[in-house]
UniProtKB/Swiss-Prot annotation:
Belongs to the amidase family. GatA subfamily. It is an enzyme of class 6 (ligase). The lineage of its organism: Bacteria, Bacillati, Actinomycetota, Actinomycetes, Micromonosporales. Its EC number is 6.3.5.7. InterPro entries: Amidase, Amidase_CS, Amidase_dom, AS_sf, GatA. PROSITE patterns: AMIDASES. GO terms for cellular component: glutamyl-tRNA(Gln) amidotransferase complex. This is Glutamyl-tRNA(Gln) amidotransferase subunit A. It catalyses: L-glutamyl-tRNA(Gln) + L-glutamine + ATP + H2O = L-glutaminyl-tRNA(Gln) + L-glutamate + ADP + phosphate + H(+).
Length: 491
């Protein structure tokens, strides 16, 4: 009998639609897998067993009644614990939100339910999406299924690790500086940051509002495209949502899977193809570029000179926005409250709550952001960073006048051991060196497995113009079809 957890989302949806397997059977298989391996991986913070089975049985009832099913009906999905889920704990990986059960679903979750997917639960993450290793979660680190002594990337390491451990065929993440793509790269899975505004932020616990982008994670490019199609599109509840339809990413993925890139012009980012990455990562990337050429793509070198300033600009813009966004967590309305013994002032209670509720990385970024926005320093730091952001956007605009898409390694290194970089924030921040530019620009990016280095996965990143997400899906699917899947060791 076929192991249901080994199948793609598209394959599982087909089984359910044809009646060859029930949604309940598919869901139970994945719940059993979570029970079997998640004590070692720790991808999930909360598993909604009864809710998942109820949703699966509802899909089976619809099929039995002859109702039409969507392309992902009956397929399990895991959701990063940064998106609100009605009645289900949402912590953003922080002690300050421990036990909070939101009264509403985020738009992404609402669309997942409407598509007939089955939500298994919430996945682990760096606190408030601030981190690159999922070691900054208040509830303990997640481990990489390729090597349990190593990190799964971050901030959305739980969503990526759950895929690599075959606990779910689909998951949802959020990407502020690389938090979907970087975990995808180091776990050998597919991670997508859609165009900013192409997926709704309504119900997303905010880190950096001008950068945060929810997106799909999967084991195949087609599965990611199907999930992207389900969650994308305009949402009037999000003022930054783009009033335009989702590009036809599913058709693009299917076209790319044919392995034909004739007529596609790709640019290798010169500044990201040399120094700054491990030799094994560069070797795998260069081999993948050779493969893209063999598939018919024309590959040229493109210079984006201001990309080198993206990392410092990001670490002024994002902390500045987070220092404002996180001011709402004060212990007054919801979540953790400390020191409310009747003998302290409201200000003292708020201070004690934040001291106990926020972890060290969150505190570091809030302090940095508060300083950058302070009187006398705003123009020198935040203002200058926004000017750099404009220059990076111009680099992208100029590049896309020459090529259809840009390619680079997704991350400079493979998964490193748990604990290896927590004492050095700068080394941790370098994990997002290649992914941050797309966030500052607002365009889409996808990470697709392209090879191995030292037995660990390496990802290739494809970046496209805003609202041209279909371009990157075509390129990623073509590469995937040529290099094949990369399967982690059995757990």
């Amino acid at each position: 009998m076929t192991d249901l957890t080994s199948l793609s989302a598209a394959e599982l949806a087909g089984l359910v639609a044809r009646g060859e397997s029930s949604a309940a059977e598919v869901t139970q298989a994945h719940l059993d897998r979570i029970t079997a391996v998640d004590d070692r991986v720790h991808a999930f913070l909360h598993v909604d067993t009864e809710g998942a089975l109820d949703a699966a049985r509802a899909v089976d009832a619809r099929r039995a009644a002859g109702e039409p099913l969507g392309p992902l009906a009956g397929v399990p999905v895991a959701v990063k614990d940064v998106l609100t889920t009605k009645g289900i704990p949402t912590t953003a990986g922080s002690r300050i939100l421990a036990g909070w059960r939101p009264p509403y679903d985020s738009t992404i979750v609402r669309r997942l339910r409407a598509a007939g997917t089955v939500m298994l639960g919430k996945t682990n993450m760096d606190e408030f999406a601030m981190g690159s290793s999922t070691e900054y979660s208040a509830f303990g680190p997640t481990h990489n299924p390729w090597d349990l002594s190593r990190i799964p990337g971050g901030s959305g390491g739980g969503s990526a690790a759950a895929l690599a451990a075959y606990e779910t065929p689909l998951s949802i993440g959020s990407d502020t500086g690389g938090s979907i793509r970087q975990p995808g790269a180091v776990t050998g899975t597919v991670g997508v940051k859609p165009t900013y505004g192409g997926t709704s932020r309504y119900g997303l616990v905010a880190f950096s509002s001008s950068l945060d982008t929810p997106g799909p994670c999967a084991r195949t490019v087609l599965d990611a495209a199907l999930l992207h199609e389900a969650i994308g599109g305009h949402d009037p509840s999000d003022s930054t949502s783009i009033p335009a339809p989702v590009p036809d990413v599913v058709a693009a993925a299917r076209l790319g899977a044919s392995g034909d890139l004739a007529g596609v012009r790709l640019g290798v980012v010169r500044e990201f193809a040399g120094e700054g990455a491990e030799p094994g990562v560069l070797a795998a990337f260069r081999a993948a570029v050779d493969t893209l050429t063999k598939l018919g793509a024309e590959v040229v070198e493109v210079s984006c000179p201001h990309f080198q300033y993206a990392l410092p600009a990001y670490y002024l813009i994002a902390p500045s926005e987070c220092s404002s966004n996180l001011a709402r967590f004060d212990g007054v309305r919801f979540g953790l409250r400390v020191g409310d013994d009747g003998n302290r002032s409201l200000e003292e209670v708020m201070s004690a709550t934040r001291e106990a509720g926020f972890g060290p990385e969150v505190k570091r970024r809030v302090v940095l952001g508060t300083y950058a926005l302070s009187s006398g320093y705003y123009d020198a730091y935040y203002g200058q960073a926004q000017k750099v952001r404009t220059l990076i956007t111009r680099d992208f605009t100029t590049a896309f006048e020459q090529v259809d898409a840009l390619v680079s390694p997704t991350t400079p290194f493979v998964a490193f051991p748990v604990g290896a970089r927590t004492a050095d924030p700068y080394q941790m921040y370098l994990a997002d060196l290649f992914t941050i530019p797309s966030n500052l620009y607002g365009g889409p990016g996808i990470s697709v497995p392209c090879g191995l280095a030292d037995g660990l996965p390496v990802g290739l990143q494809v970046m496209a113009p805003t609202m041209a997400d279909d371009r990157m899906y075509r390129v990623a699917a073509a590469l995937e079809s040529a290099v094949g899947p990369f399967t982690p060791p059995a757990l």
